[in-house]
Swiss-Prot record:
Subunit structure: Part of the 30S ribosomal subunit. Contacts protein S5. The interaction surface between S4 and S5 is involved in control of translational fidelity.
Protein name (Swiss-Prot/TrEMBL): Small ribosomal subunit protein uS4A
Keyword S-adenosyl-L-methionine: no
Biological process (GO), any one: ribosomal small subunit biogenesis
Domain S4 RNA-binding: 98-163
Amino acid sequence: MARYTDAVCRLCRREGLKLYLKGERCYTDKCAITKRNFAPGQHGTSRKKLSNYGVQLREKQKAKRFYGVLESQFRKYFDMADKQAGNTGENLLRILETRLDNLVYRLGLASSRAEARQLVVHGHFTVNGGKVDIPSYLVKAGDAVAVSEKSTNSPKFKELKENFKGTVPTWLTVDSEKLEGKVAAMPSREDIDLPISENLIVELYSK
């Protein structure tokens, strides 16, 4: 499974906004974009005016980086979204939101999507009672996601249970005592709070 392995703070600086890729650090003064709010590289301090194509490309890159998805997987999701009824851009965001790693993050069971992905891969979560270790697994309305019984006794999740402070989107419910959550409904566009202009991504792929 291919993954981005360079310093993730460079991605935030490239996009010019916080992508919240490093969990708690992103909320402190240690955040790289707080210290150096310009693109990485020799000419990073001078941002050039982008063409229409450049604007569309940056929007796609931003969405990919928020969710930690590489190009081949992202294109697959777009093709899925395009075949569904309704607005293609909104369908795309809905698919991305229902990835298991994103759900673990949204439920407050991980401090970042990257950490959530790692925890899923290591087998710490179940979906409807069965272990799932695939971060890209797509959940559905009614699915229950929980920390596995074996993992609830680990120091990581004991601490999380004692200090749980997550707030979840309206399409999810969470039981912090049991360390489990449920997909109450599929997310609408209004439920997705990321600064993404999905119509620009649709325009890019429609060329």
